[in-house]
């Protein structure tokens, strides 16, 4: 017979959940531009860093296009993540086909 263990229930916002999931993959670099509604993801990841739970390098960009470029460059040597919004994804779009052609991975 299979024994079911008690599960801990945690209530988080979508952004907090995304940051928590990102923490689990122990990524190396986050290129980001704070844009609503995804700003909280970078804030939560920075909080994890301040608590010593992550050693991620966070690189702020001057726009979504630049943030995607930071992730593209960093993906050649480590795990990267970028958090954005629908509008931010549109601004970053020019970078993505180039990166996909090189097969360097990025969590978006």
Q: What kind of region is each of these model predictions?
A:
Residues 1-108:
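Thiamine diphosphate
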């Amino acid at each position: 017979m299979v024994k079911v263990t008690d599960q801990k229930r945690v209530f988080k916002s979508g952004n907090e959940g995304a940051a928590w999931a990102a923490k689990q993959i122990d990524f190396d670099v986050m290129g980001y531009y704070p844009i609503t509604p995804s700003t909280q993801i970078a804030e939560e990841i920075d909080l994890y860093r301040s608590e010593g739970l992550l050693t991620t390098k966070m690189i702020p960009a001057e726009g979504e296009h630049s943030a995607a470029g930071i992730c593209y460059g960093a993906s050649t040597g480590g795990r990267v993540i970028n958090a954005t919004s629908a509008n931010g994804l549109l601004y970053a779009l020019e970078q993505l086909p180039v990166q996909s052609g090189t097969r360097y991975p990025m969590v978006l």
